[in-house]
Structures are given as structure tokens and as C-alpha cells.
Amino acid sequence: MLRNAVLLLGIVASGATNRNPTISVAPSLAVDERMIGRWDITIATPDGEKPSWLEIEHSGRDQMVGRFVGVFGSARPISVIVVNGDSLSFSIPYQWENGNGNLSVRGAAQGGALAGAMTFPDGKTYSWTAVRAPRLDGRPTPAWGAPIRLLHANDLGGWHSSGTTNQWTVVNGLLSSPRSGSNLVTDRKFGDFKLHVEFRYPKESNSGVYLRGRHEVQIQDDFGNPPANDRFSGVYGFISPSVIAARPAGQWQTYDITLIGRMVTVVANGKQVICNQEIPGITGGALDSHEGEPGPLFLQGDHGPVDYRNIVITPAR
């Protein structure tokens, strides 16, 4: 329809005697295919390595756009990625970082990888490297192994705290974090799995279950709210649930999650809210960006009180 309209305008403008109107279209410029795709980033900081994630896409004739996930926070759109030969750069507004400046990224292609420097909103600059994210697609449904109960009756065996202090306790199989503090991480790592978890939170509290330590399924007091990718049962910053199936705060609730490669299905309180959708990359707060490797389960404990019970994981054989 648009092309026909343009042709008609050309005919009218050139006069009836011009029986062969032409349309001028700017030529496409070459796009460096080495940049396009998803990248797992590792940032070198004085406090150790920190994970991030970058997606670069070709838009239109010669533009690059994308998404970025920082050390924490949700996926942010990148309206323009400047590519000049082997180099790239972009700048985006701050989100949850310290400081009020932009987050600015500079980098260059180095063989099959990327490397560069990242300046945070507080003005501090760190070096980073990135490898192409593994696809992890096309996997058949695996044969499942035996279910593993991850909680002991009265101790934290099989788990460790991510911080210097630990506020988590287990009494009679009830795992509790009475206040904001450290996250809790399984000692064991998993690849593909099915997970059953039961949880309870007080009003306005927040937690999350990180699959392989990299992909957060949000736990939050969202009873009565519309769906969003940062709300109850969403994959934080990436995938919105079809509905919010949350119960009122103070009640026990359940997730049944299946993760095969990047494909995730989430059943919240008996209702399927995400059906075999792709998780594009790591979410903010991930332990690392090594997406091709098995990883632990971790429970977010730094956003308010929360209780868990009956955590059962069934790994693929």
C-alpha cells in the first residue's frame, strides 16, 4: 500500500507524459555481522568479576540497536549503537547504579569476542570482555532423574550464603529469611531441570528464584496487579506472565518451573503463566554470565522477609 502511494505521488509530480516514474532509495550500507547477536559479558572490578549481557541487532539500512542488562536491574533498550569498523559504543541512562550520569560502553571486536571499557553512572571505569552467548536451543525433552529435596529439616546443609552474614534459618523444614540480607545458594549445580517451590511473603515484600543462578523468576506481592515482566512469576525484565496468579500476601503459594536450555515454562499456583518461552539472557543480579554451564539455584534474600518450604528439583539425566 505504501509503495503504491509513493508511485502515485511520483506520477502526479512528474506529469502525465512521464510514463516511467522512478523511485530513489538510499543504498544499504554494510553491517559488521561480527557485532550482531547476544553477548555474555564479564566486567573486571576491584570487588571481583561481575556479569552483564548485551544484545545487538541490525535495524533498517545501517543502524544498530539492542538491549543491555547490567550487574543488577532489568533489560534496557539501546536506541543507537554506534559501529565504526571494529569498534562499537553506546550510552544509556542510569537505572539502579550509583550516580546520575549515563552508563557508557566502548568496545571492539577481537576475533570471535568483544572487549572494551565500561564507564558507570558514578564515573568509575572498568574493563570488560564478552563471548558470544550459547544458543541452547533445539533440545528435546529430557528423561528426568529422581527428585531431590533441597531442604533439610533443621539445618542449611547443601546451601551457602552469598554474603558475609547469614540471616536464613531452617526449623522443621521451614526456610526463613526474617529480614533483608544475603542471598542463599545451593552447593550443587544443575543443567536442565523441573523445580517445585513453595513460598510465602508478607505484604509488599519481594524475593526471587534464580534458575542456574542466572535467570530470576520474580516473587513479589502483586495480588490484583496486571502482568508485567518485573512482577510475580515473570522472568525479570524479559518475559511477562499471561496473568498474575498471585494470592494475597501471607498465603502459601507455589511455582512449578521447567527449564530446558533457554526454554522456560512457569506454572504459578496451578495456572500456567509462561509456556515454553525463550529466556534471551541473564537477568540482573545473576551470579555470573556463563550461560552454557550448569549453575546453582539461588533464593533472593536482600529484598525483604520471605519463607520457603518443599523445594524439590528434578534434574535431567
Q: Positions of the model-derived regions?
A:
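Sec-dependent signal peptide recognition
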Residues: 1-8
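Intrinsically disordered, low-complexity peptide-like regions
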Residues: 2, 16-18, 254
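Bacterial Sec-dependent signal peptides at the C-terminal "C-region" and cleavage site
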Residues: 9-31
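Carbohydrate-interacting regions of secretory-pathway proteins
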Residues: 20-26, 34-38, 44-57, 61-317
